[in-house]
Amino acid sequence: MSLDAMFVAGLKDELSRALEGARIDKIHQPERDEIVLAVRGAKAPGRLLISANPGKARVCGLDGMRENPPNAPMFCMLLRKHLTGGRIRRVSQPGLERILDFEIDVMDELGLPAKKTLTAELMGRHSNIILRDGKNMIIDALKRIDIAMSEKRQVLPGLIYDLPPKQNKLSPFDYKRADIFEMLCGAKKDESVEKWLLDTFFGVSPLICREIAYRAAGDTTIGIRGLSDSERERVAAEAENIFTAVKSGGFKPCILYDGDKPADFSFVPITQYGGLYRLKVYEDMSCLLRDFYDIRDEKDRLQKKARDVMKTVNTAYERANRKLELQRQELADARNREEI
């Protein structure tokens, strides 16, 4: 899915407007890798889901109730101790990372004002939820990462929180059309436009890189060698248009439907698939994420039920066939009973 850093930038803007000043009333952990905050405020969504599930990491408003375990997990109890009654001061995105920081004003054990930060790292299989104190020290994390798991970055109680290691890429917000055109002219000719964009700029997903190539040259797989000068200009222009839209908050989130099943989503309308996918545009990203994963989960549940029913039917069919074969054999043996 396309929960890239640019999508997270739009989500951050949206959550900032909705959550700043909201009070955290309750905290639940319905799943091993999901936290639900009950938040109260003028624009707050009521319940906020923070998921570190590797396949569907996200932060969004939540419709309906989730079934909670009879006994709250230890991490949930820790969050309740530190964050219940706190007010969300600020929602931020460090750099252009797939990370959201929720800065929360709370009262400490002595009744004095303090600051805690709840961090949602939305990075696929590296997704995590981390609680920090006002000195940037990790209080605890949903997934503890020790040196045996990662030599580059550990996430453990008592350690100072560090951002994930930087990639050797450029910020898309620092370069204009002329700069992008000049870099493109000096790029390796045997690379595709998609790969060059992906390797050059930080925070851009493969879907968006292909979209830029398609808008510029009508081909998602076109190589740099095959570009005319005018097409190079268009690649630079389309890249600048998308980067500028993100910087200025010009998001137009949409879901791509394959029939009635959500296939992908983006922060800008996607044109590269033509009429193959149906496009549904949303007003806000939180609703998009909620619908995308709710619909997919429901369809996955239905497919699982269908598979379970088919397995039961096939098992019963095979059992009946075996019984029928035994009865046929008994009948054949019975025909010779007079001779015996």
Q: Model-derived features: where do they sit?
A:
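Extended, highly charged segments
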Residues: 1-340
